[in-house]
Amino acid sequence: MSKNKDISVVSPNAALVEASGVPALLDQIRPAWKAKSLISRVQRLVSVDPSSACQRLLNAAIHDLKEKVVIAGLDIAGEAAKKHKLPSVDNAEDIENYSTAKIIDLAYRMGLLSRPEWRRVARCYEIRRDLEHEDDEYEAGVEDCVYIFKTCIEVILQKDPIHLLKVTDVKEIVE
């Protein structure tokens, strides 16, 4: 076989995923994330392997969520973690080491995700865990892929980070 020829096997679900509006959803991602190679990889994969594309998109959303937790404030993250018996947060590295399930919980406990958003993102993670095992017990359908795309983009990747005021900032202004 020649090295110059690319072979791509298109998933039978790829056309359905594209027809369901996923490419239009990808246009809603914030420019800061659209510029990243991970999102361009997702755009290329959608038409070939939607299951892998949605796994990568969820990875991007979780990374974005971690960044948003740090931007919102490590002091708030630390308090929320302590109050809700999550792993302690003292610095940004602690957030990087948080598991996916725990970062979803922490973002909810900090108020970065509403309860319905938290449930949707947690469900996406559950679907992705099922996909990772790639066993015969569960196979992602078109609806699962579309759900992950829609949730990750609408709940996380299209929203700008929230900059919260800190008590120390207010004290400095008052003084």
State the predicted function of each range:
Residues 129-175:
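Elongated scaffolding segments in large macromolecular assemblies
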Residues 2-123, 138, 161-175:
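Amphipathic alpha-helical interface elements
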